A protein has these predicted regions:
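Alpha-helical membrane segments and immediately flanking helix-loop junctions
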Residues: 59-94, 120-144, 155-161, 273-322
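Extracellular/periplasmic helix-exit of transmembrane alpha-helices
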Residues: 117-129, 241-257, 265-271, 304-307, ...
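Membrane-interface alpha-helices at helix entry/exit sites of multi-pass transporters
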Residues: 58-65, 96-105, 143-155, 188-197, ...
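Membrane-interface loop-to-helix entry segments
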Residues: 24-31, 35-48, 173-180, 198-259, ...
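N-terminal alpha-helical transmembrane segments of multi-pass membrane transport
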Residues: 1-82, 92-99, 110, 245, ...
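Flexible loop linkers connecting adjacent transmembrane helices
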Residues: 38-66, 90-100, 104, 112-147, ...
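Transmembrane helix-loop junctions in multi-pass membrane proteins
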Residues: 2-5, 35-40, 83-88, 166-176, ...
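Helix-loop-helix module between adjacent transmembrane segments
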Residues: 31-33, 106-131, 138, 142-174, ...
Length: 465
């Protein structure tokens, strides 16, 4: 029975996360780019000025439940995760350095996709019985497409609830305990027998912290993420830039391997990778799965933003993809390629390759700081996905009374994830994660005209000033 479930899940997973899904996501991103006049390029300076330039200004009086900065930090908390460290390493190992170039290309379209998701989420959001602003794909399907498309909103919420326990929590906690275990063993191998107990303790502590943050409501979530995300991002950026500076002599070759290797991977992988298609596939998939453009999840956080201007908040969607993929993922690639650490091209790789890059540059002590970065990334992801799951549960059951019990259960999963091998459950959750994109992409396709109209009205009026 278990084998049958695993086989069926693998078949569905391969399709959902395979080439058809990537083609659909890229196609929708291209359509949205055309209908908005490639807004992400034309208005990129405006997007940066509107986001980074105003992040720390005093917020305008409004009726939201998060500041725009807190909203983007919450979305980034869920988006910038362990995949930025492990996923990029895997893309380079299988697709060669050229995969990074194709990752950049996918991010370019992803910027417009996420911009559209955020804009629609703010435009079609509503208030729940507690007076909180709620939105996301299920709400712009419900309020933007009408009753006959309601089943898509229900499906999105169902897939979201089924996803968060594995993708958003258990796998992340497992990454935390693995990072801590590795750091401990690097200094004292005699404590190996104590690790199961240590993992349980870590799981309990994480569960308590998650419960404290999530049960505190939307304002506490925003307060935590606006402090944690800038810290962890800056911390990782400083470490990664340090690797580039200390290995600056390799930078010209690395850039050549990325750009030229995108079209001739064989020349830069010792002949191990000869397929340009494989380089494209791995780079594009890494870009899509890293920034979550097309899944619609980030828009759930942005819908809580303290703003009356959907398009202006949408600019944070452009910034989010830029920060996640163009900055964080690129820096991970630079750590691996600039450090000169051996890459077994053609063989699967993960976080260990990135850690090896840091260790080759800074020495063994850097394993502690890498573990700290992994823990911060994973914990922030748990917080962000907790919000997503609670919003999906609230929509699915049509009452906010399920939120409290849901978050308690969600927090408890941290203990399970820290102490058990959940291989099949993780794979099933990953499949449901991919299934979330189907109703969202359909909605984006049908509402692309609304996005184009909102953009035109915004920049033609006073809103852009």
């Amino acid at each position: 029975m278990i084998e049958t479930i695993a086989a069926v899940n693998q078949a569905v997973n391969s399709f959902i996360w395979g080439i058809p899904a990537m083609v659909c996501i890229i196609g929708v991103g291209l359509l949205l780019s055309v209908r908005t006049g490639f807004l992400q390029i034309r208005k990129f300076p405006y997007a940066i000025r509107t986001t980074i330039g105003r992040m720390f200004r005093k917020k305008d009086a409004s009726d939201g439940t998060m500041t725009p900065f807190q909203a983007v930090c919450t979305a980034l908390a869920a988006t910038v995760g362990t995949g930025n460290i492990a996923g990029v390493a895997g893309a380079i190992a299988i697709g060669g350095p050229g995969a990074v170039f194709w990752m950049w290309c996918s991010a370019l379209l992803g910027m417009c996709t996420k911009f559209s998701e955020v804009t629609l989420a703010v435009h079609f959001r509503e208030r729940n019985k507690n007076g909180e602003l709620v939105g996301g794909p299920m709400y712009y399907i419900k309020n933007g497409l009408g009753q006959r498309w309601q089943f898509l909103a229900v499906l999105y919420s169902l897939f979201g609830v089924l996803t968060v326990f594995g993708t958003g929590n258990a796998t992340q906690v497992n990454t935390i305990v693995t990072a801590i275990d590795s750091a401990v063993l690097a200094y004292n191998t005699s404590v190996k027998s104590f690790l199961p107990t240590l993992n349980l303790i870590v799981g309990v502590v994480v569960a308590m912290l998650v419960a404290m943050v999530l049960l505190g409501g939307i304002k506490r979530i925003g307060s935590v993420t606006e402090k944690l995300v800038p810290f962890m991002a800056l911390f990782y950026v400083v470490l990664a830039v340090g690797v580039m500076v200390l290995n600056v002599q390799r930078l010209p070759y690395v850039l050549e391997s990325i750009i030229a290797g995108a079209f001739n991977p064989r020349a830069f992988t010792g002949g191990a990778i000869g397929s340009v298609f494989l380089s494209v596939q791995k780079g594009v998939s890494r870009g899509i799965f890293s920034n979550e453009a097309g899944l619609g999840t980030g828009s759930i956080a942005h819908a809580c933003a303290d703003t009356r201007k959907p398009v202006k908040q949408g600019m944070f969607g452009i910034f989010e993809v830029f920060a996640d993929t163009i900055v964080i993922c690129t820096l991970t690639a630079m750590v691996i390629l600039c450090s000169g650490v051996p890459v077994g091209y053609g063989a699967a790789a993960g976080a260990e390759l990135t850690i090896a890059g840091f260790t080759a540059t800074y020495g063994g002590w850097s394993s502690i700081f890498t573990a700290m970065a992994l823990c911060c990334f994973a914990f922030s992801t748990i917080i962000g996905w907790g919000l997503y799951g609670s919003r999906c549960a609230e929509f699915l059951f049509r009452t906010d009374k399920v939120v409290g019990p849901f978050l308690v259960l969600y927090s408890f999963v941290s203990i399970v994830g820290a102490t058990m091998d959940l291989g099949l459950l993780w794979n099933i959750a990953d499949t449901f994660n991919g299934l979330m994109s189907i109703p969202n992409l359909i909605a984006l396709l049908l509402l692309s005209g609304t996005v184009a109209k909102l953009v035109k009205e915004f920049f033609a009026g006073e809103g852009a000033r």
